[in-house]
């Protein structure tokens, strides 16, 4: 093994250890869609039980990721029934995929010398946002990692592999399509041989996943793309779920990349070394700023590109001042490590390491109850719960917050919802009706003091994101279920 390969191996080991430590020691959900759009649908495919959100009632999501998760869940069921087993295995695989950011950063900086490669790869290994998002089971994150690797491979002349990864990224997150297309256009321009190689690698992937899989899953090719656009853009679902100002993403970048002016200058300098990546990041931010509904995860492609471009910018700056080559990389590495640690552990971003922790822990506690025959859930929005993903028991769940056909202001369609057990719908009793049918469940998740006289608390949980809300408790009443 060469010295540079050994250096990269050490960085990858550090990066993977940090990412695994994050999800093994910090129970958190990056976003509720992670549970209900992907884990929950995988659980439903594997075991027949799960909450079915409107996206899967209407068929605007690809079944690719849920099917992959379902396979892992079935395999882990041969070992044990702990839901954290399959959750952590899937998170571990996603964390392994996230290491492509470290590889790309290191390899792109090698031209400036060993210390430049260590600085850039090291920054990608320890940057807090990359560690936080790495284990996330979200198409935005997985597609971004595929896209980053594709752009680097295309730059190395491996167009067919790049095309295959671009096709996969497009099928996972078609909203990244314009950004990746702009980046590839910069790389390839009028080189028709490279375009042909990209098409040879990418078109079969797109046809197989977007065309055939959607046809088998939903009855029409590419339905997860065109119906998604119809529902969210033309029928107003996306905007009805929330609007943010055009300053939403700049405000996040100001916090996540503080001190932004210094790091932004490094990004600009680094963009000269990897312009395609800078184009992809810039187009992602511009296009998503124009969309009313904004969430940080939507622009993860830009967030992942940031540390690479910052490292390349610092590497170019160090190269310009030879007298700094021995001292600057070490000093910059220490400073960036401390900065990453500070941003991860100080408000306002520190609270997200415990996002929905109490909710997940309550469902995990219910999983461990041998006498469980039915579970009631109060005081939590249905998509903030752990669902069957974290309960992983073949018993009915009854949600107080249940609307079978939610109508959002500004949207022309109703969002249909269902709870399935053994492939059959579980009748729900929303609102006050849940208390009237407590014979159907003998365990109840509710805020402390809101369970009723017949229920005794077994364990209570809280987290930083609950604020002043009462702890969330798992309660039990004597007897079984009617």
Question: Where are each of the predicted segments found?
Answer:
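Transmembrane signal-anchor helices characteristic of membrane glycosylation enzymes that use polyprenol
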Residues: 6-32, 126-128, 172-175, 202-218, ...
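Signature aromatic-anchored transmembrane alpha helix within multi-pass, membrane-resident enzymes
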Residues: 8-16, 203-208, 274-278, 282, ...
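Transmembrane alpha-helix segments characteristic
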Residues: 10-17, 118-120, 124, 166, ...
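Transmembrane-helix motifs of polytopic, lipid-linked glycan transferases
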Residues: 13-16, 88-115
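Catalytic lumenal/periplasmic loop and adjoining terminal transmembrane helix
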Residues: 27-28, 215, 323-473, 477-480
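Short acidic/glycine- and proline-prone juxtamembrane loop motifs at membrane-interface regions
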Residues: 31, 58-61, 129-142, 296
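Specific aromatic-rich, kink-prone transmembrane helix
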Residues: 104-107, 122-127, 142-165, 305-309
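Membrane-lumen/periplasm interface segments of specific transmembrane helices
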Residues: 174-189, 194-265, 277-278, 289-290, ...
């Amino acid at each position: 093994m060469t010295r540079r390969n050994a250096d990269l191996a050490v960085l990858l080991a550090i990066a993977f250890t940090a990412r695994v430590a994050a999800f093994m020691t910090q129970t958190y959900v990056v976003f509720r869609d992670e549970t209900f759009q992907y884990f929950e649908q995988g659980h439903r495919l594997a075991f027949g039980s799960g909450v079915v959100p409107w996206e899967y009632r209407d068929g605007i999501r690809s079944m690719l990721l849920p099917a992959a998760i379902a396979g892992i869940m079935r395999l882990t069921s041969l070992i044990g029934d702990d839901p954290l087993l399959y959750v952590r295995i899937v998170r571990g695989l996603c964390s392994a995929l996230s290491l492509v950011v470290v590889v790309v950063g290191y390899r792109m900086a090698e031209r400036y010398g060993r210390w430049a490669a260590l600085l850039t790869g090291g920054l990608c290994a320890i940057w807090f946002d990359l560690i936080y998002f790495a284990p996330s089971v979200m198409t935005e994150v997985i597609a971004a990692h595929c896209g980053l690797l594709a752009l680097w491979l295309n730059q190395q002349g491996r167009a067919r592999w790049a095309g295959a990864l671009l096709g996969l990224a497009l099928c996972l997150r078609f909203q990244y399509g314009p950004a990746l297309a702009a980046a590839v256009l910069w790389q390839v321009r009028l080189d028709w041989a490279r375009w042909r190689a990209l098409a040879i690698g990418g078109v079969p992937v797109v046809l197989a996943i977007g065309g055939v899989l959607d046809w088998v899953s939903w009855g029409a090719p590419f339905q997860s793309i065109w119906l998604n656009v119809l529902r969210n853009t033309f029928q107003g679902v996306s905007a009805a779920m929330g609007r943010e100002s055009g300053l939403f993403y700049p405000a996040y970048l100001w916090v996540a990349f503080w001190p932004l002016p210094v790091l932004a200058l490094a990004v600009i300098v680094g963009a000269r070394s990897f312009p395609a990546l800078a184009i992809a990041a810039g187009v992602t931010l511009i296009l998503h700023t124009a969309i009313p509904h904004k969430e940080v995860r939507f622009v993860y492609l830009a967030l992942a590109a940031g540390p690479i471009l910052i490292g390349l910018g610092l590497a170019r700056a160090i190269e310009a001042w030879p007298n700094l080559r021995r001292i600057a990389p070490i000093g910059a590495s220490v400073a960036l490590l401390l900065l990453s640690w500070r941003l991860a552990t100080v408000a306002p971003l520190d609270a997200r390491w415990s996002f929905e922790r109490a909710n997940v822990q309550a469902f995990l506690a219910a999983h461990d109850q041998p006498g469980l025959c039915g579970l009631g859930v109060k005081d939590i929005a249905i998509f903030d719960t752990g669902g069957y993903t974290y309960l992983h028991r073949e018993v009915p769940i009854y949600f107080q917050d249940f609307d079978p056909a939610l109508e959002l202001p500004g949207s022309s369609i109703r969002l249909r919802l269902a709870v399935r057990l053994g492939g059959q719908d579980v009748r729900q009793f929303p609102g006050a009706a849940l208390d009237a049918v407590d014979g159907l469940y003998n365990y109840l998740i509710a805020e402390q003091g809101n369970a009723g006289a017949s229920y005794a608390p077994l364990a209570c949980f809280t987290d930083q994101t609950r604020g002043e809300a009462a702890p969330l408790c798992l309660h039990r009443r004597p007897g079984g279920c009617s």
